[in-house]
């Protein structure tokens, strides 16, 4: 935390700094965030995220909840279980091997909103450990790639997040991701189409585009203050895991 305070001092002295964070720019995450911000769920009160680790997870969780720098009470635990080892950065497995894996589960109580963080490191590469997202509001919710919401007190609409990719079923536009729609509305359009890129590569590329815009006088897209806050929440979550007791965050210098 002291190192982040020192780094933020550069901003206080006039430095212009953004941080290269891409997870909230992943196509489906960006589509979910846009849908939440569109208001159809009403006031969002809870988000459950099992997608990515540490500060990456915090960055997505905060956006789904509409949280800025509010303080939280955090309780967290870990749970170790066996799992058949899957692929990794060096490639697929060559034989069956059972290894131990650690699950992190944390409850972040922001008072009027609740964040639930749940992650196992194997989720990045495992053949069977998937991702899960739930966002709950007073008028509806998102569960993974489906939204359900009220248009009035007795009428519910259920609609999927539809992924649009070029190049399948006879389509000759090329092989690339186009975006996501919910109903008739585009929630996300790929800014790097028609590049043939993975979702993570699209997110990193979008981050670079936004960094260039910022350097040219454009708006923040992931400020040092946000990055410090997400890492701070991650640090306090680890503290709660290790101590086994609730931890309370306090307002930091980068929160203004």
Show where each model-derived region lies:
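Phosphate/oxyanion-binding loops and surfaces in catalytic or ligand/nucleic-acid-binding neighborhoods
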Residues: 64-68, 141-142, 237-243
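Soluble or luminal CAZymes and related metallo-dependent hydrolases
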Residues: 24, 28, 53, 98-100, ...
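NAD(P)-dinucleotide binding in Rossmann-like oxidoreductases
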Residues: 112-205, 223, 250-254
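A contiguous active-site-proximal alpha/beta segment in oxidoreductase catalytic domains
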Residues: 1-60
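Rossmann-like dinucleotide-binding domain that binds NAD(P)(H)
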Residues: 43-130, 134, 225, 254-255
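C-terminal helix-rich "cap/oligomerization" subdomain common to oxidoreductases
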Residues: 6, 12, 16, 185-256
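Loop/helix-junction capping segments adjacent to catalytic residues or to phosphate/diphosphate-binding pockets
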Residues: 26-27, 55, 125-126, 221, ...
């Amino acid at each position: 935390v002291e190192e982040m305070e020192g780094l933020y001092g550069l901003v206080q002295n006039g430095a212009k700094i953004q941080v290269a964070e891409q997870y909230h720019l992943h196509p489906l995450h960006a589509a979910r965030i846009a849908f939440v911000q569109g208001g159809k769920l009403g006031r969002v009160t809870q988000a459950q995220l099992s997608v990515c680790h540490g500060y990456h997870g915090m960055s997505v969780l905060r956006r789904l909840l509409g949280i800025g720098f509010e303080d939280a009470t955090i309780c967290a635990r870990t749970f170790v279980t066996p799992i058949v080892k899957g692929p990794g950065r060096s490639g697929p497995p060559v034989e069956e091997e059972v290894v131990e894996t650690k699950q992190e589960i944390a409850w972040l109580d922001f008072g009027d909103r609740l964040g639930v963080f749940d992650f196992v490191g194997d989720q990045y590469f495992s053949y069977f450990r998937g991702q899960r997202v739930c966002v709950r509001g007073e008028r509806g919710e998102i569960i993974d790639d489906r939204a359900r919401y009220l248009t009035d007190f007795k009428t519910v609409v259920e609609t999927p997040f539809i992924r649009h990719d070029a190049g399948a079923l006879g389509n000759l536009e090329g092989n690339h991701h186009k975006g996501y729609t919910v109903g008739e509305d585009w929630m996300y359009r790929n800014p790097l189409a028609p590049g043939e890129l993975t979702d993570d590569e699209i997110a990193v590329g979008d981050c670079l585009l936004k960094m260039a815009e910022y350097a040219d006088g454009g708006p923040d897209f992931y400020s040092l203050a946000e990055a410090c806050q997400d890492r701070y929440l991650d640090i306090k979550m680890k503290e709660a895991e290790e101590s086994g007791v609730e931890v309370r965050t306090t307002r930091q210098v980068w929160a203004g």
